[in-house]
C-alpha cells in the first residue's frame, strides 16, 4: 500500500538522495532476521512468528505520521523490515505443513494468489488515499489492515509438532542454523532475479511520472493482476512439469520485461513490461517456494524457507541501492536505462543457471549407468 508513495514522501522530507534506502534498509533487517525467524518457526511455532510480523506492521504503520525527519523515517523503515523477515517465512512453512507434497506447487500458488490480490489492490488504494486524503490516512489504514491480520492469526491452529515455549537462548544461532545448504539452488536463482524488483519499486514512480502517468501505483496493479491471472490458470504447472522448467520460462519473461522498461518511451511499452513482469512473478514465486520445500528436510523447513527469503531480501536491497545510486549519478533516462539494463543481465544469468540445471537433470546419472553395465557383465549378460 505504501511503496508507490514513499519516494515522493521522503523527497518531501528533504531526503531525495536517500531514495535507495527506502527499500534497502527495509530489506537489510528483513534479511538479517531471516535466520532467527527460521529457527523460531521450527521450534516455537509458525503462528507466533506470523503474528509477530503482523504486529510490527501495525506499530510501524501507526508511527510513520509522527516521525517527520529524514532520519526518523529511515530508522522506522529499518524496524519495519522485521515484518517481512518473519511473517513470510512462517507462512510458507505453515502452508507446506498442511498440504501433500504432490500439490505443493498448487498450494503455494494459492498463497501467492491472495498475496498478489493484496499487492494489486494495496498500491492503488494507497495512492488514492494519499492523493484524496493524506499520507497519514494511508499510513493508518495500513496499520488497521495489519491489526485485522493479527486477529485472524490468533484463531489459527498451530501445525508444528511439539512446539517449545520461547526463550531468549533460541536467538543464539549456530553456523549451521544460519544457512540451509539444501536451499542453495533456489537461493542463487532468487538472488539474481530479485535485483529487478528492488529496481522496479525504487524507480517505477520516476518512470511513471516521466511518461505522464499520474497514479504511480498502477504499474503494480497491472503486474499484480497479470500475476493473479497466471496463478489462476497455471496453479498446478510446476506440479505437472517440474519446478525448474517453469522457473526457466518465468526467468525468460523477466528478462523481456526488464528489456522493455529500458525502451519504455510510451505508455504502451510500459504496460506491456508490467504485464510480462506479472506473468513472470505469477509463475516464479509459488514455484520457487515449492522447490525450496521439496529440497528441505521436514525438520528444517523453516530454515530452508528463511534461506530462500534471505536471497530475496538481499537481491531487492542490492537492486534498490544500486538503482538509487545509478539514478543519482546518471540523471534522467540514463540512470533508469542503466538500472533496468543491469536487472536484465542478472536475470539472464539466472536463466542460464536454470537452463544448466534443467539440462543436468535430464541427463542419466553416469555412475548409475556404469554400475548397471558392470553388473550386467558380471552376470554374463551381453
Could you tell me what each predicted segment is?
Residues 144-162, 353-358:
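C-terminal membrane-cytosol helix-exit motif in multi-pass small-molecule transporters
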Residues 158-190, 373-380:
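Juxtamembrane intracellular "pre-TM" segments in multi-pass secondary transporters
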Residues 78-115:
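Cytoplasmic helix-loop-helix junction between adjacent transmembrane helices
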Residues 1-22, 185, 189, 194-207, ...:
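Helix-loop boundary and gating motifs at the non-cytosolic
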